[in-house]
Each structure stands twice: as C-alpha cells, then as structure tokens.
A protein has these predicted regions:
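Intrinsically disordered, low-complexity regions enriched in acidic/Ser/Thr/Pro/Gln residues
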Residues: 4-168, 173, 179
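Feature captures the catalytic cores and cofactor-binding loops of soluble hydro-lyases/lyases
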Residues: 187-190
Length: 190
C-alpha cells in the first residue's frame, strides 16, 4: 500500500517508529489498517586505546547510545565501570570508544558476531560475564512490586504505541524511579 511515515520521538530528537498502511486480510473481507513499528538502526562500536577492536554492528532503537555502549562494555567484562571510558564519540552510526585499558582476554573474535540483531543478546555467546551477587536485606512487598510495574508501563511510550519493545526500569529502595528506557532488542535497555 506504500504509505510510510515517521512518528514519535524516542529521545526527543529522532523518530521512534514508522506508521505503515497495511492490508488486513480476513475470512470475509479485507481492510486497510495503520500499523506502527518501532525503528531499529545499526550502531557500529569500535574500541580504541591500548588495543583497537571493532566490536561489531548492533541493531538498536536510536537514542540512549551512551547508556547502551557503557552497559554493553560492562556486561561483556570489557570494562569494570564507567570510569574506564575516557571518551565516546558518535559520528552518524559509528561510535568510537576510547578506553583506559582494554583487557585482550575480554575480546575474542570467535565468540562475537559481527552483526548483533535485536534478539535477547545472549544468543550465540560462548560464555556469560559473571556479576557480583547483590548483598542486601531489603525486601519489596507484593503491592509495591505491582506499583513498580504500573509505573514502568506508564513510561514505556514506544511499547504503548507499537507493542514491539523491551523495557527496563530501576527503582531505589524508597520507591523512587531512577531510570526507565526501552529498545527493540536490548533486554537491558538501560
């Protein structure tokens, strides 16, 4: 049917989804319906520092790229914290990250696909990076858990419009929402 328009703004700057006029075929008749699909764009991540390495191309919802890069590098065991990143320069769809030190063992070409699609992020990995266990006596009531869920859903604008994104929301021990983000494929959208 051919009608595609860009709408919404995920990060306040770029379109968040496209609207497509679609033909819906039923048993008795067909009709025209408007479908909203979240955008997914490539981002190539290149590391520089004592070791240069192309991590690959990551498919993601545009926006929040610094958070994606920092979380990815931490979860992959390449950095120990955000202080290991000296600078990040994003030029179009290429991000160059200058690191203090790159651990060569954390970057092995055999367990990294060149193109990372919007799947769960674990598929195809040889091993998972170990994280410290949370050491806390804090508990959350069932009622508060439901409140957190409702608050998180209210901040998932892309999901509300498209039904096609993952969301992640963090709260502190007092119930204050720290952050909430969405993405097509990042389960750890923050």
């Amino acid at each position: 049917l051919g009608m595609i328009t860009m709408e919404g703004h995920h990060d306040g700057k770029r379109p968040a989804w496209i609207s497509v006029d679609s033909r819906v075929i039923g048993r008795q008749d067909d009709s025209i319906a408007n479908y909203k699909a979240p955008l997914e764009n490539p981002l190539r991540i290149v590391l520089s520092g004592n070791l240069s390495h192309d991590l690959g191309i990551y498919m993601r919802t545009p926006g929040n790229d610094l958070e994606l890069i920092t979380g990815l590098l931490y979860n992959e065991g390449i950095i120990n914290g955000h202080e290991d990143i000296i600078s990040t320069e994003i030029d179009g769809e290429v991000a160059t990250v200058l690191l203090r030190d790159v651990n060569p063992q954390s970057i092995t070409p055999n367990d990294r696909p060149f193109l990372v699609t919007g799947s769960c992020g674990v598929c195809g990995r040889g091993e998972l990076h170990d994280h410290k266990m949370v050491d806390s006596e804090e508990t959350v009531s069932q009622h508060r858990l439901h409140e957190y869920h409702n608050t998180a859903r209210n901040h998932q604008r892309l999901f509300y419009h498209t039904g096609g994104t993952h969301g992640a929301t963090a709260f502190d021990v007092n119930g204050f929402m720290i952050s909430s983000m969405e993405d097509v494929g990042r389960h750890n959208a923050m």
